[in-house]
Amino acid sequence: MIGTTSVSRAIGCATISCLLLGLASGASAAPPARALMLQSSYGSTLEARLLASHNRERAAFGAAPLKWDPNLAVAAASYGPSLSAIGRLQHSSRANRPGQAENLWMGTRGAYAPEAMVGAWNDEKRFLRPGVFPYVSSTGNWQDVAHFTQVIWKGTTHVGCAVHRDARYDFLICRYSPKGNIDGRRVP
Protein backbone atom coordinates (compact mmCIF):
# COMPACT_ATOMS: atom_id res chain seq x y z
CA MET A 1 0.00 0.00 0.00
CA ILE A 2 1.27 3.44 -0.85
CA GLY A 3 -0.24 6.59 0.60
CA THR A 4 0.58 10.25 0.90
CA THR A 5 0.57 12.62 3.84
CA SER A 6 -0.27 16.28 3.69
CA VAL A 7 3.00 17.97 4.69
CA SER A 8 5.47 17.52 1.82
CA ARG A 9 5.11 14.31 -0.06
CA ALA A 10 5.67 11.24 2.00
CA ILE A 11 4.90 7.77 0.85
CA GLY A 12 4.45 4.84 3.21
CA CYS A 13 4.38 1.15 2.42
CA ALA A 14 3.31 -1.88 4.43
CA THR A 15 4.38 -4.75 6.65
CA ILE A 16 7.93 -5.88 7.66
CA SER A 17 10.77 -4.50 9.81
CA CYS A 18 13.28 -1.69 9.64
CA LEU A 19 17.05 -1.43 9.48
CA LEU A 20 18.56 1.78 10.53
CA LEU A 21 21.42 3.65 8.99
CA GLY A 22 21.91 6.21 11.66
CA LEU A 23 23.75 6.93 14.82
CA ALA A 24 25.25 3.97 16.64
CA SER A 25 22.87 3.13 19.41
CA GLY A 26 24.95 1.91 22.26
CA ALA A 27 22.63 -1.08 22.57
CA SER A 28 24.05 -4.03 24.43
CA ALA A 29 24.11 -6.23 21.33
CA ALA A 30 26.63 -4.91 18.84
CA PRO A 31 25.37 -4.72 15.27
CA PRO A 32 26.94 -7.16 12.82
CA ALA A 33 30.15 -5.92 11.20
CA ARG A 34 28.45 -5.51 7.83
CA ALA A 35 26.11 -2.88 9.26
CA LEU A 36 27.08 0.56 8.13
CA MET A 37 26.41 3.04 10.88
CA LEU A 38 26.55 6.69 9.87
CA GLN A 39 26.51 9.77 12.05
CA SER A 40 22.91 10.92 12.12
CA SER A 41 21.66 14.45 11.75
CA TYR A 42 18.67 13.53 13.91
CA GLY A 43 20.17 14.39 17.29
CA SER A 44 19.55 11.53 19.70
CA THR A 45 19.98 8.07 18.32
CA LEU A 46 17.78 7.22 15.41
CA GLU A 47 17.22 3.79 16.90
CA ALA A 48 15.79 5.19 20.12
CA ARG A 49 13.52 7.64 18.32
CA LEU A 50 12.13 5.03 15.93
CA LEU A 51 11.60 2.54 18.75
CA ALA A 52 9.82 5.15 20.89
CA SER A 53 7.53 6.08 17.98
CA HIS A 54 6.51 2.44 17.65
CA ASN A 55 6.16 1.75 21.36
CA ARG A 56 3.99 4.81 22.13
CA GLU A 57 1.32 3.45 19.80
CA ARG A 58 1.74 -0.10 21.06
CA ALA A 59 1.20 1.05 24.66
CA ALA A 60 -2.00 2.85 23.66
CA PHE A 61 -3.34 -0.44 22.26
CA GLY A 62 -2.16 -2.70 25.10
CA ALA A 63 0.75 -4.30 23.21
CA ALA A 64 4.09 -4.97 24.92
CA PRO A 65 7.00 -2.74 23.85
CA LEU A 66 9.08 -3.89 20.92
CA LYS A 67 12.76 -4.67 21.43
CA TRP A 68 15.40 -3.47 18.98
CA ASP A 69 17.01 -6.22 16.91
CA PRO A 70 20.29 -5.14 15.27
CA ASN A 71 20.13 -8.06 12.84
CA LEU A 72 16.73 -6.89 11.58
CA ALA A 73 18.20 -3.40 11.24
CA VAL A 74 21.10 -4.73 9.15
CA ALA A 75 18.66 -6.62 6.94
CA ALA A 76 16.57 -3.47 6.53
CA ALA A 77 19.60 -1.35 5.67
CA SER A 78 20.72 -3.81 3.04
CA TYR A 79 17.46 -3.21 1.16
CA GLY A 80 17.82 0.60 1.04
CA PRO A 81 20.06 0.72 -2.07
CA SER A 82 17.50 -1.37 -3.97
CA LEU A 83 14.76 1.15 -3.20
CA SER A 84 17.04 3.99 -4.21
CA ALA A 85 17.85 2.27 -7.50
CA ILE A 86 14.18 1.93 -8.47
CA GLY A 87 13.17 5.30 -7.00
CA ARG A 88 9.93 4.07 -5.48
CA LEU A 89 8.58 1.81 -2.78
CA GLN A 90 8.42 -1.89 -3.49
CA HIS A 91 8.51 -4.57 -0.85
CA SER A 92 11.45 -6.92 -0.73
CA SER A 93 10.68 -10.49 -1.67
CA ARG A 94 9.33 -12.66 1.13
CA ALA A 95 12.10 -15.15 0.37
CA ASN A 96 14.60 -12.48 1.47
CA ARG A 97 12.81 -11.88 4.76
CA PRO A 98 11.44 -15.21 6.03
CA GLY A 99 9.20 -14.81 9.07
CA GLN A 100 9.54 -11.03 8.93
CA ALA A 101 7.16 -8.22 8.07
CA GLU A 102 8.22 -4.94 6.46
CA ASN A 103 7.01 -1.35 6.57
CA LEU A 104 8.39 1.10 4.01
CA TRP A 105 8.27 4.90 3.87
CA MET A 106 9.68 7.41 1.37
CA GLY A 107 9.91 11.19 1.55
CA THR A 108 11.94 14.20 0.45
CA ARG A 109 15.55 13.96 1.63
CA GLY A 110 16.07 15.64 4.99
CA ALA A 111 12.50 16.97 5.25
CA TYR A 112 11.15 14.56 7.88
CA ALA A 113 12.06 13.66 11.44
CA PRO A 114 12.06 9.94 12.32
CA GLU A 115 8.89 10.47 14.35
CA ALA A 116 7.11 11.86 11.27
CA MET A 117 8.23 8.89 9.19
CA VAL A 118 6.75 6.36 11.63
CA GLY A 119 3.93 8.83 12.23
CA ALA A 120 2.76 8.36 8.64
CA TRP A 121 2.10 4.70 9.47
CA ASN A 122 0.59 5.56 12.84
CA ASP A 123 -1.82 8.01 11.20
CA GLU A 124 -3.54 5.04 9.59
CA LYS A 125 -5.18 4.35 12.96
CA ARG A 126 -7.92 6.77 11.94
CA PHE A 127 -9.20 4.02 9.61
CA LEU A 128 -8.76 1.14 12.09
CA ARG A 129 -11.85 -0.86 12.91
CA PRO A 130 -11.00 -3.43 15.58
CA GLY A 131 -11.80 -6.90 14.40
CA VAL A 132 -10.31 -9.92 12.69
CA PHE A 133 -7.60 -9.30 10.10
CA PRO A 134 -8.03 -8.44 7.21
CA TYR A 135 -11.47 -7.00 8.04
CA VAL A 136 -10.05 -4.16 10.12
CA SER A 137 -10.42 -1.02 8.01
CA SER A 138 -13.34 1.40 8.00
CA THR A 139 -12.57 1.97 4.30
CA GLY A 140 -13.07 -1.71 3.48
CA ASN A 141 -9.45 -1.94 2.26
CA TRP A 142 -7.06 -3.59 4.75
CA GLN A 143 -4.05 -1.98 3.03
CA ASP A 144 -5.25 1.38 4.39
CA VAL A 145 -4.28 0.24 7.91
CA ALA A 146 -1.63 -2.43 7.24
CA HIS A 147 1.37 -0.35 8.32
CA PHE A 148 -0.34 0.61 11.55
CA THR A 149 -1.60 -2.88 12.33
CA GLN A 150 1.97 -4.16 11.93
CA VAL A 151 3.23 -1.47 14.32
CA ILE A 152 0.74 -2.53 17.02
CA TRP A 153 0.58 -6.28 16.26
CA LYS A 154 0.64 -7.98 19.67
CA GLY A 155 2.54 -11.07 18.49
CA THR A 156 5.43 -9.01 17.12
CA THR A 157 8.27 -8.65 19.64
CA HIS A 158 11.24 -7.20 17.72
CA VAL A 159 11.93 -4.45 15.20
CA GLY A 160 14.98 -3.18 13.36
CA CYS A 161 14.99 -0.19 11.03
CA ALA A 162 17.23 1.77 8.72
CA VAL A 163 17.07 5.08 6.91
CA HIS A 164 18.65 5.05 3.47
CA ARG A 165 19.33 8.48 1.99
CA ASP A 166 20.04 9.17 -1.66
CA ALA A 167 20.32 12.47 -3.55
CA ARG A 168 16.54 13.04 -3.54
CA TYR A 169 14.85 10.83 -0.98
CA ASP A 170 14.99 9.28 2.47
CA PHE A 171 13.71 5.72 2.67
CA LEU A 172 12.72 4.21 6.01
CA ILE A 173 12.74 0.44 6.06
CA CYS A 174 11.52 -1.40 9.17
CA ARG A 175 11.57 -5.14 9.64
CA TYR A 176 9.45 -6.91 12.26
CA SER A 177 9.63 -10.36 13.86
CA PRO A 178 7.55 -12.37 14.23
CA LYS A 179 5.53 -10.91 11.39
CA GLY A 180 2.02 -9.63 11.96
CA ASN A 181 -1.02 -8.97 9.78
CA ILE A 182 -2.01 -12.63 9.83
CA ASP A 183 -5.43 -13.50 8.42
CA GLY A 184 -7.91 -14.69 11.02
CA ARG A 185 -6.17 -13.01 13.97
CA ARG A 186 -7.72 -10.29 16.09
CA VAL A 187 -6.56 -6.65 15.83
CA PRO A 188 -5.68 -5.00 18.13
Regions found by a protein language model. Give the residues of each.
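A short alpha-helix/helix-coil micro-patch that ends at or immediately precedes a cysteine
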Residues: 34-88
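Short, glycine-/polar-rich solvent-exposed loops and beta-turns at beta-strand/coil boundaries
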Residues: 69, 95-97
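A well-ordered secondary-structure block
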Residues: 98-188
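Histidine-centered active-site/metal-ligand motif
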Residues: 54, 90-93, 147
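Bacterial N-terminal signal peptides that target proteins for export
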Residues: 2-14
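Boundary at the C-terminal end of the N-terminal hydrophobic targeting segment
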Residues: 26-29, 35
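Cytochrome P450 catalytic domain signature, combining two hallmark sequence patches
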Residues: 83-95, 127-133
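Bacterial N-terminal signal peptides
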Residues: 12-22
